[in-house]
């Protein structure tokens, strides 16, 4: 029986490293993009040649980063052509690209739509210029609105906007105003995340040395509740702890993660999971490129998930979603353990 699965591709290039971001990204390396694209194509071909993926039914592709919207459409089309040699592209329901307002030109947006990308995720983060500056974002609130309108004109009918709360000096009123302004745009999907202090980031350093004071847990919780309330009142369904969507506009790719479905991944730092094993690539562009030059996969390490690991992950992921834990799927994953009998006891 085939399993619905996703494909993730990581583009590490950025114009600036945001102080709160712990995803793998690099600046001042855009000259490496042509070589990077060729390496992604090589990784795809190598991976499919070395792995039996016949039981996986790929229906989503997610282009993340970094800043994928810095990549010219014809380069991304090369990647799609490589994938089409191994998968049935007619089965793909959703192709998402992450984009930063102010960095995705009208020409690029039109080009993305023409090559089959049907969903775009804008990293707004805030519509307050002061808070955007704190977050090291290069765009302004006005550029967010312009980028959204340009995407609509380019033909995107499925748009997500990422927002952040729990930002120092962000009041409940500012948060409410920002959310209502975003909702006026009527995106199909809104993600809203609490700003977390990740080790190794500039934000972590500034919080540790006292330069930045984070909001307390009570205010963080109030912001979360206000966000949920505003979204609900505006017709957005909260289907996961941080994600809100209009009817039938959930992010299909992210549902694969939360359902513990298989997904494969390409690019530096990318993580994949085939239903039994999880693996992750080297978190270095130079190492990634050099290993593929030797016709080897750039996998740093892997682990076999035990039944207990799968059980715990399905419970934790399920509790984040509105549908809760899928007992039938839990039974399938755990094999010998009959969850229904355990619950009755």
Predicted regions and their residues:
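Short active-site neighborhood of thiol/selenol oxidoreductases, capturing the structured segment around
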Residues: 8-10
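Cys/His-rich Zn2+-binding cysteine-cluster or related metal-binding knuckle/ribbon modules and their
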Residues: 54-55
């Amino acid at each position: 029986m085939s399993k619905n699965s996703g494909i993730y591709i990581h583009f590490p290039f950025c114009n600036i490293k945001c102080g709160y971001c712990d995803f793998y990204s690099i600046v001042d390396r855009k000259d490496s993009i042509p070589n990077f694209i060729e390496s992604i194509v090589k990784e795809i071909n190598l991976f499919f040649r070395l792995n039996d993926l016949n039981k996986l039914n790929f229906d989503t592709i997610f282009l993340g980063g970094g800043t994928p919207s810095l990549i010219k459409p014809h380069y991304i089309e090369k990647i799609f052509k490589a994938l089409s040699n191994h998968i049935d592209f007619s089965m793909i329901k959703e192709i998402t690209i992450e984009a930063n307002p102010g960095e995705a030109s009208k020409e690029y947006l039109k080009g993305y739509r023409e090559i089959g990308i049907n969903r775009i995720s804008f990293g707004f983060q805030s519509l307050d210029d002061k808070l955007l500056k704190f977050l090291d974002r290069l765009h302004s609130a006005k550029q967010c609105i312009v980028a959204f309108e340009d995407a609509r004109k380019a033909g995107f009918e499925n748009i997500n906007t990422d927002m952040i709360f729990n930002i120092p000096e962000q009041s409940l009123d500012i948060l409410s105003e920002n959310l209502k302004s975003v909702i006026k745009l009527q995106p199909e999907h809104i993600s809203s995340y609490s700003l977390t202090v990740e080790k190794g980031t500039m934000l972590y350093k500034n919080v540790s040395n006292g330069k930045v004071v984070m909001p307390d847990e009570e205010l963080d919780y109030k912001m979360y509740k206000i966000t949920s309330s505003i979204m609900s009142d505006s017709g957005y369904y909260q289907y996961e702890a941080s994600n809100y969507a209009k009817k039938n506009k959930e992010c299909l790719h992210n549902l694969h993660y939360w359902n513990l479905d298989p997904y494969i991944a390409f690019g530096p730092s990318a993580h994949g999971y085939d239903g039994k094993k999880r693996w992750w690539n080297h978190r270095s562009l130079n190492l990634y490129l050099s290993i593929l030059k030797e016709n080897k996969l750039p996998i740093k390490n892997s682990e076999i998930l035990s039944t207990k690991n799968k059980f715990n992950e399905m419970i934790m992921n399920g509790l984040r979603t509105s549908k809760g834990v899928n007992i039938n799927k839990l039974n399938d994953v755990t094999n010998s353990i009959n969850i229904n009998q355990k619950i009755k006891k």
